[in-house]
Amino acid sequence: MKPVLVLAILAVLFLRLADSVPRPLDVVVSEIRSAHFRVEENQCWFHMGMLHYKGRMSGNFTEKHFVSVGIVSQSYMDRLQVSGEQYHHDERGAYFEWNIGGHPVPHTVDMVDITLSTRWGDPKKYAACVPQVRMDYSSQTINWYLQRSIRDDNWGLLFRTLLVYLFSLVVLVLLTVGVSARLRFI
């Protein structure tokens, strides 16, 4: 039982250290094309094979404006409509705020776009975000992380994914064998 406890402690330490190391994919690109609108917050990331996106844009908005969030890849196009409920107006002015969490996407997603338009105008791209990959080390999404690491030629993500998956299998086998051996002698 002591080796299993030591392995569990090492696994927790490894998971915490792996998440604290900055990844080369942690690049956030912000393009501001107008003096009337300003992107104040722009974050996006992958977690458990799903896209999470958070941001805020302020400026000269009216209730006729709306923001659309688009997911762009070579083989996948999707537009998420941020509803009017995210439109706010207070003493600081008008702003849009969005927090999209848990939108399932394939491993081929390259970028997330924010477009702003009025009900009758053409949408214009105001910001873009390259999603960072945040590991979750669950067996549900092992295939997604393997495909993403091979697609991006990210060998660090590939080896980290394989190492953690194999480590979790070893711990599972040790726990199973330890419990069955203990039950046999009771």
From Swiss-Prot:
Family, as annotated: Belongs to the cytomegalovirus US2 family.
Single GO molecular function: D-mannose binding
Keyword Disulfide bond: yes
Cytoplasmic side: 182-186
Disulfide cross-links: 44-129
Membrane topology: Single-pass type I membrane protein
Domain of life: Viruses
Residues annotated as glycosylated: 60
Lineage, opening ranks: Viruses, Duplodnaviria, Heunggongvirae, Peploviricota, Herviviricetes
Description of how the protein assembles with itself and partners: Monomer.
PTM entry text: The signal sequence is not cleaved. N-glycosylated; mostly exists in a high-mannose form.
Record function comment: Retains, but does not degrade MHC class I heterodimers in the endoplasmic reticulum during the immediate-early period of virus infection, thereby impairing their transport and maturation. Forms a complex with beta-2-microglobulin-associated class I heavy chains, which accumulate in the ER. In consequence, infected cells are masked for immune recognition by cytotoxic T-lymphocytes.
Protein name per its UniProtKB record: Membrane glycoprotein US3
Coarse class of the protein's main subcellular location: host cell
Record topological domains on the Lumenal side: 21-160
A Pfam family recorded for this sequence: Cytomega_US3
